[in-house]
């Protein structure tokens, strides 16, 4: 049987001026996804994808690096300004927003879309260290 050669599709350079940055910041990781206004992903990055492991993955510095990486990739597609939606209680929320601004993207709005339960699931037990 003939072996199939791995052919990767060439990335098409999109020309997108405005977009949305979705920052998901949990206690363990921070994921930054940059999309166009319709929600189609342009670029993404996370602290874990950059090689941070364990407790270092949840630091503000790791979130900053993830946001910078995602911003650089999105700026190659022509992204200039964006709205930011932040979800979750993690440490990397503010650091990720600051990193997006420092990368040269204009932040027009910041929206907190953290889901708040109307007394849904029982929370995890308190930690005793």
From Swiss-Prot:
SUPFAM superfamilies (alphabetical): Translational machinery components
Membrane-spanning ranges: none
Key words, A-Z: Ribonucleoprotein, Ribosomal protein, RNA-binding, rRNA-binding
GO molecular function: rRNA binding; structural constituent of ribosome
One Gene Ontology term, aspect cellular component: ribonucleoprotein complex
One GO BP annotation of this record: translation
Reported function: Located on the platform of the 30S subunit, it bridges several disparate RNA helices of the 16S rRNA. Forms part of the Shine-Dalgarno cleft in the 70S ribosome.
Family assignment from sequence similarity: Belongs to the universal ribosomal protein uS11 family.
Subunit structure: Part of the 30S ribosomal subunit. Interacts with proteins S7 and S18. Binds to IF-3.
NCBIfam families noted in UniProt: PRK05309.1, uS11_bact
Protein name listed in UniProt: Small ribosomal subunit protein uS11
């Amino acid at each position: 049987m003939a072996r199939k050669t791995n052919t990767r599709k060439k990335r098409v350079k999109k020309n997108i001026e405005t977009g949305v940055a979705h920052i998901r910041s949990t206690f363990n990781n921070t994921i930054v996804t940059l999309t166009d206004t319709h929600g189609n992903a342009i670029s993404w990055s996370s602290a874990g994808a950059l090689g941070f492991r364990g407790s270092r993955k949840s630091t503000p510095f790791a979130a900053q690096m993830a946001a910078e990486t995602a911003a650089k990739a999105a700026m190659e597609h022509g992204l200039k300004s964006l709205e930011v939606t932040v979800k979750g209680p993690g440490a990397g929320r503010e650091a990720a927003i600051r990193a997006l601004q420092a990368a040269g993207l204009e932040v027009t709005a910041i929206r907190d879309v953290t889901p708040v339960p109307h007394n849904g699931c029982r929370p995890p037990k308190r930690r005793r260290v």
